[in-house]
Amino acid sequence: MLIHPQFDPIAFSVGPLSVRWYGLMYLIAFLLFMTLGRVHARRRPELGWNAQQLDDLLLYGMLGVVLGGRLGEVLFFQPAYYFSHPAEILAIWKGGMSFHGGFLGVLVAMWLYGRRSGKGFWQVTDFIAPLVPTGLAAGRLGNFINGELWGRPVQTDVPWAMVYPWVDALPRHPSQLYQVAGEGLLLFAILWVYSARPRPLKAVSAMFLIGYGVLRFAAEFFRTPDPGIFGTLSLGLSTAQWLCVPMIAVGVGLLASTRTDPAH
């Protein structure tokens, strides 16, 4: 059995400036996005992306992630708390970002970017889909370092079970690390390989929706459910699981619709 290290929330300080782990993880995520985006553009030059377009895409994506992720946390998971403490809504350095809200925010941002750049919406989402899991991995690692979003108590004796002393003395699943491995590394590997070859328009986006939806749905069985708009558990499923259901359905529908389309 392991004990959570209880990291200092401050990663490092430079003079009066303190950098929190959560903010550092976001910086790492954006750097990974830019680096891998350039690699992806070079290996698939026929997609027609240049460095300036990638810089603009990052700016739009960053705004979509931060604004959408925070609003999603407020509206989907903790509306009562944030409506009672409205000043906390802007305190993103303390953590509390919803993937599903960030996902919707990115969709809006990519639509706006597509209109500005002249690229089609699906052309944009197909390009960024393989890059997103690295950001998810960095975010979940930040959750683990912050000691938040811990797992459910283990039902069997497993050597990697972890005690979070500020919660209770029960050994729990380190579900944040499960999500780093699943929604982060595994999903990245699948999409990176899948997108290396020409695919029909929308196919890579569809694979992301299916892959993320399935992996997040599974991870929720090991994670302590967040309170949310559907209640902590509704019909045996968490709010995040309910939000994954339409993602998977849309992904399957999109993928099916591309079966006879030409690869690009």
Curated annotation (Swiss-Prot):
Give the UniProt entry's GO cellular component terms.
plasma membrane
User: What does the entry give for GO biological process?
Assistant: lipoprotein biosynthetic process
Give the highest taxon in the source lineage: Bacteria
Per UniProt, subcellular location reads as: Cell inner membrane
Question: Which positions are annotated as binding a 1,2-diacyl-sn-glycero-3-phospho-(1'-sn-glycerol)?
Answer: 140
What is a single molecular function from GO for this protein? phosphatidylglycerol-prolipoprotein diacylglyceryl transferase activity
Give the record's membrane topology. Multi-pass membrane protein
Biological or metabolic pathway of the protein: Protein modification; lipoprotein biosynthesis (diacylglyceryl transfer)
Transmembrane parts of this sequence = 14-34, 57-77, 89-109, 127-147, 176-196, 202-222, 235-255
The set of disulfide-linked cysteines is none
Q: What class of enzyme is it?
A: transferase
Give the keywords, sorted: Cell inner membrane, Cell membrane, Membrane, Transferase, Transmembrane, Transmembrane helix
Question: Which EC numbers does the record give?
Answer: 2.5.1.145
Record-stated family: Belongs to the Lgt family.
Q: Its function?
A: Catalyzes the transfer of the diacylglyceryl group from phosphatidylglycerol to the sulfhydryl group of the N-terminal cysteine of a prolipoprotein, the first step in the formation of mature lipoproteins.
Q: What is the official name of this protein in its record?
A: Phosphatidylglycerol--prolipoprotein diacylglyceryl transferase
Organism for this UniProt entry: Aromatoleum aromaticum (strain DSM 19018 / LMG 30748 / EbN1) (Azoarcus sp. (strain EbN1))
What's the source species' lineage? Bacteria, Pseudomonadati, Pseudomonadota, Betaproteobacteria, Rhodocyclales
